[in-house]
Amino acid sequence: MTGYEDPRLEKMFLPNDKGDYVGIRIGIDVTSKSQAQAKYSNMIVTSSTPYLWINAAEVAFLKAEYELRWGTKDAAKALYEQAIRLSFEDKGAKDADAYIADKTRKPAAYNDPLGNYSATALSSITIAWEDDSAEGADKAAIKERNLERIITQKWIAIFPLGVEAWSEHRRTGYPKLLPVPTDKSGGTVDVCLLYTSPSPRD
């Protein structure tokens, strides 16, 4: 979200002790709770925050994906843009139209404030919908990039539904996530949760 200079960021997270927005990379070793609270951003979620089951933006993103795969390109684009506007409205953020039109901003590199787990971004996907009508355009590649746009923006819009976000990634491979520093899965994302040993049945 920082690479996109996303106006929703400040509505969803608190800055760290330096005023920056920095998430904790999955699978890193943070040994001190106080250090984590100071150096990384925290979610703006309290005990009175309503539980999100599904929001209007997610519905529009689902429709956009359907239209991209089996419907019309114009409908997919319109629904993608509507979904982002709905997400901005839901989060109380402004300037959705400028955000939707942005053709240059891309995901930022991850700069770990502790200095141990920084990494370059794995995706260069921009926000604005990509048109495939130009002569000689690689329609299949553009369709795949637009799918990445839909799922990346959907990932942002459905926060803080972690299980749902995990399911979207398993299903589509998007958004492109940094691998955990200690990779015990061979570079793949788990498709089920394993019981501990001994299992509850033992």
Range-by-range predicted roles:
Residues 129, 184-194:
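Short, intrinsically disordered, charge-balanced linker/junction segments flanking boundaries
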Residues 1-63, 69, 76-140, 144-153, ...:
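Hydrophobic-face positions in mid-chain alpha helices that act as interaction patches
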Residues 94, 101, 168-169, 184-187:
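Residue-level signal for alpha-helical context at structural boundaries
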Residues 179:
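Asp-centered catalytic/switch region of ABC-type ATPase nucleotide-binding domains
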Residues 156-171:
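Bilobed periplasmic-binding protein-like "clamshell/Venus-flytrap" ligand-binding domains
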Residues 175:
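Extracellular glycan-recognition regions
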Residues 195-202:
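Conserved small/polar residues in nucleotide/adenosyl-binding loops
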